[in-house]
């Protein structure tokens, strides 16, 4: 076992304060064409299942601003098959983020029922959306803009995907992922988004960008006429703020946790460089020989989608898996490869030893090993001696403490995570 030091990545960030978040969310609503909806009309506000910083505050502000403007907003879960593909499950997902009728001051209408609003123009795919949203006088979706974990394109994870996949509920999500195997997601999302924009009174979306520390960097109102072009520009900004591992070639990486509240892929493929989605290519970097993942976040509620990216997992993670929840999610997305169960180990010591012994001929002095809390919290990392030495030569890295032996108790790693375990 190599000794491990602590390094930090030097990121310059300027997150919004709580007051600024509320002000930016209200201003974002003001940038939407509300006049397209008759005064007193209903506006369906789509909210997803991702763990987004300040989500409850942003949603509450959007709802309050619409109400003060003379409209009757209601919230609907726009999260595809998440929450076990049930209305009750999706309502519970929102509640875990503090989004309840009492807290938001408006109704939450949750249903898995959909209605067809059109067909694809180049591929004859049915375009379906949430029934309640389709019956509203206007639709507005709220989502974070970020690189997707399974494909690259002009728009990836954001407003367009929420309209197509999230608002499509399980049926729409299943159709989208099925057709994506032969018709790439990068082409399908814009095409189906245009069908939805033509069929419904979508007044736009509230786009959120987060910085490398997982904090709110910007909130922007995007009108429907600019939805695809503006989202593409915002995606460029999101790429620049995407946290990454600071080395391109690594022997072993330990992640203390994975989960759906961290990334749709459990472990963000933009960080791991691993992508097992049929028809899509993996990122060019980093190259990681072995990945060990220790536990599943409580916020995942057993959904271990993406566990197949790891080479070794702790038995605690395996025992925390809800197989049915995981299977529903991955059958809907079509990415069954991500449900493959890695080697399981009863102790951290056994798991780390398995990774080291299968990563090539290495010594404690030469092995390139990192330990991170998860793929979203990458500011502070444990690093082996070889990587600590490399960090001293770089202006973007700082060595916080020199390597010391890893501490185990009965085989369990007792050194705390680089940053606090747990997620919103």
Describe the predicted segments one by one.
Residues 1-24:
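N-terminal amphipathic/basic leader segments beginning at the initiator methionine
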Residues 28-44, 67-68, 246-247:
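Glycine-rich phosphate/diphosphate-binding loops that line cofactor/substrate pockets in enzymes
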Residues 42-51, 74-81:
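Short glycine-rich or small-residue beta-strand-to-loop segments that form or flank ligand, phosphate
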Residues 53-71:
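Histidine-anchored nucleotide/phosphate-binding helix
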Residues 89-154:
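An acidic, phosphate/nucleotide-engaging active-site surface
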Residues 125-212, 221:
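Divalent-metal (Mg2+/Mn2+/Ca2+)-assisted nucleotide/phosphate chemistry catalytic cores
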Residues 212-270:
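A conserved active-site cap/scaffold subdomain adjacent to cofactor or substrate pockets
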Residues 269-424:
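C-terminal non-catalytic interaction/assembly regions of soluble proteins
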């Amino acid at each position: 076992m190599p000794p491990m030091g602590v390094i930090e990545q030097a990121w310059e960030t300027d997150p919004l304060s709580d007051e600024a978040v509320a002000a930016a969310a209200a201003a974002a609503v003001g940038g939407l064409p509300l006049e397209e909806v008759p005064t007193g009309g209903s506006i369906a506000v789509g909210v997803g299942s991702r763990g987004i910083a300040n989500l409850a505050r942003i949603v509450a502000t959007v709802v309050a601003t619409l109400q003060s403007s003379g409209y009757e907003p209601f919230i609907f879960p726009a999260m595809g098959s998440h929450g076990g593909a049930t209305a009750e499950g999706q309502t519970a997902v929102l509640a875990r983020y503090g989004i309840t009728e009492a807290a938001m001051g408006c109704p939450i209408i949750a249903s898995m029922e959909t209605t067809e609003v059109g067909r694809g123009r180049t591929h004859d795919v049915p375009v379906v959306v949430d029934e309640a949203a389709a019956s509203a006088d206007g639709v507005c979706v709220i989502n974070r803009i970020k690189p997707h974990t399974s494909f690259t394109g002009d728009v990836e994870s954001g407003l367009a995907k929420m309209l197509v996949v999230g608002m499509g509920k399980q049926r729409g999500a299943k159709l989208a992922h099925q057709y994506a195997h032969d018709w790439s997601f990068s082409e399908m999302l814009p095409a189906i988004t245009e069908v939805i924009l033509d069929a419904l009174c979508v007044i736009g979306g509230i786009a959120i960008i987060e910085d490398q520390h997982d904090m709110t960097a910007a909130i922007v109102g995007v009108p429907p006429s600019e939805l695809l072009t503006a989202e593409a520009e915002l995606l460029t900004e999101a790429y620049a703020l995407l946290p990454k591992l600071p080395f391109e070639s690594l022997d072993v990486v330990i992640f203390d946790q994975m989960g759906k509240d961290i990334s749709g892929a459990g472990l963000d493929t933009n960080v791991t460089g691993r992508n097992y989605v049929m028809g899509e290519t993996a990122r060019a970097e980093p190259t990681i020989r072995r990945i060990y993942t220790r536990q599943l976040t409580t916020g995942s509620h057993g959904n271990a989608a993406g566990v197949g990216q790891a080479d070794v997992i702790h038995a605690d993670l395996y025992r925390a898996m809800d197989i049915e929840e995981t299977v529903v999610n991955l059958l809907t997305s079509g990415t069954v490869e991500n449900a493959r169960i890695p080697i399981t180990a009863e102790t951290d010591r056994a798991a780390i030893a398995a990774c080291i012994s299968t990563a090539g001929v290495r010594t404690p002095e030469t092995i390139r090993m990192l330990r991170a809390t998860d793929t979203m919290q990458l500011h502070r990392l444990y690093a082996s001696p070889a990587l600590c030495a490399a960090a001293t030569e770089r202006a973007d890295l700082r060595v916080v403490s020199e390597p010391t032996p890893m501490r185990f108790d009965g085989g369990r790693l007792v050194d705390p995570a680089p940053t606090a375990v747990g997620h919103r």
